[in-house]
Each structure stands twice: as structure tokens, then as C-alpha cells.
Amino acid sequence: MKRDVDARGRACPIPIVELMRAIRESSVGDEVEILADDRAFPSDVRAWCKKTGHQLLSLTEEGATLSAVVRKENVP
């Protein structure tokens, strides 16, 4: 299953908080796509995935919008 989260217009740390909530509510293997426009988001999402063990599948930028797709992994 894929979930979509729109965190555009929200400053750090809210996009990561919204991602955490979506991952928590997802099943292992599900993907969450999050849209953000906070310029700190790319480094934040990379660090969060590294820290938590969830997999960052893609990180793209189109205009002012950043898009990350994260897969929930089977981690404690």
C-alpha cells in the first residue's frame, strides 16, 4: 500500500513528524510518499531513515516541491 502525505508549507520538524506518523500507521513493506518544500527536508529525511532503518527509495525535486518515498522496514 502507498500513503501520500502533503507537508508543503510546514517548517521543520513537521514534515518528519508527519512522516513518522504515516510510517507508524503503515505495515512493513508499505511506502509513504511525502511532499515538502522546507529546504532542510532532504538532509532531515536522509538522517531520519538512517537512524530508524526505514529505506529511502527516492528523493526528487520538482520546482519548489521535494518528494521522498520511504518504505517501512521490519525494524524495532
Positions of predicted regions on the chain:
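Amphipathic, hydrophobic secondary-structure cores in small proteins
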Residues: 10-55
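Residue-level marker of intrinsically disordered, low-complexity segments enriched
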Residues: 3, 12-15, 67
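C-terminal structural segments of small proteins and small subunits
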Residues: 46-76
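Short amphipathic
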Residues: 1-8, 33
